Amino acid sequence: MENPNNQTTYLVVDGENIDATLGLSVLDRRPNPEERPRWDRVLESAHGRWGQKAKGLFFLNGSSGFLPMGFVQALTAMDYSVIPLSGPAEMKVVDVGLQRTMDAIADLGKGDVILASHDADFRPQIETLLDQGRRVAVMCFKEFLSSQLHELEERGLEIIDLEYDVHAFQVRLPRLHIIDIDDFDPMSFL
C-alpha cells in the first residue's frame, strides 16, 4: 500500500458559495475584513486532516472580466492555485469547473478531496469518490450544508465546520448552533 504521506489531499474551494453563505446566511451583510476566512488556516487544516500534502484549488467566477487582484495575489502567496473561470451568463461556471475537477481527481485513481462548499450540485462527484474508497470531506458552515450532502455522512463523508473545526476566523461569528449538554456553560449566556 502506498505511503499516505505520498498521497495528496485536494482542497477544492467554491469561493462564491463560501462568500455568499458567509454574507447572506451567517452575517446578513457584507463581511468586514476580520470576518472573512483565513485561507492560510484552511489550507493548513486540509494538510493536517489526513496527514498528507494538500493542494489548494480556489475557483473564482471571472465572467465579468474583473478579478479581485489583491485577493488573488494573497491566495497565490499562500500556495493556492487560483482558477478564474468564465462562460455564458446562464452557466454556473464555478460549479462546472469544480465538477470537472472532481471528475478528473476520480479519474486519477488516487488522492482525497476536501470540498469547501454547501452545494448539493457536487453530490454525484462526492458519491463517485466515496465509492472508490477515497476520503472525502465537505468544509462548510454545518447548519447551511445541503441536506443531500448531510445524507452522505453514513457513507463516509466527513463534515468539517469552517469556524468550529478549522478555526478559520479571527472573530467569533454570530451563529446559532446546537450545544452538547456536556459543553454547555450557562455563564457564557449571563
Residues covered by each model-derived region:
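Nuclease catalytic cores that cleave nucleic-acid phosphodiester bonds
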Residues: 64-190
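Domain-level signal for Mg2+-assisted phosphodiester chemistry and nucleotide/NA-binding surfaces
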Residues: 1-92, 135
